[in-house]
Amino acid sequence: MKTLLLTLVVVTMVCLDLGYTRRCFNQQSSQPKTTKSCPPGENSCYNKQWRDHRGSITERGCGCPKVKPGIKLRCCESEDCNN
């Protein structure tokens, strides 16, 4: 009986996908592509671009941060959407 109950709990968790987290790219500028699993409840990714003395800079990650004027920001809500 305990085995049946445990099996039902596991199947329910798998079917409901309770542990789902968003995955976003998180590399900086021209670095090799890397991804990161976002914290639970964080459902968006961002791509932030600006220029400074080093040239054009790109930052990617989880969430949708507030930015200062002059910084381009694109937020999205699907897997790996911020490349």
From Swiss-Prot:
One of its GO terms (molecular function) is toxin activity. The keyword Secreted applies. PROSITE patterns: SNAKE_TOXIN. Transmembrane segments: none annotated. It holds the Pfam family Toxin_cobra-type. Expressed by the venom gland. Disulfide bonds join 24-45, 38-62, 64-75, 76-81. Keywords: Acetylcholine receptor inhibiting toxin, Disulfide bond, Ion channel impairing toxin, Neurotoxin, Postsynaptic neurotoxin, Secreted, Signal, Toxin. Its main location: secreted. Residues 1-21 form the signal peptide. The keyword Cytoplasm does not apply. GO terms for cellular component: extracellular region. It is found in: Secreted. Belongs to the three-finger toxin family. Short-chain subfamily. Type I alpha-neurotoxin sub-subfamily. Binds to muscle nicotinic acetylcholine receptor (nAChR) and inhibit acetylcholine from binding to the receptor, thereby impairing neuromuscular transmission. This is Short neurotoxin D. The lineage of its organism: Eukaryota, Metazoa, Chordata, Craniata, Vertebrata.
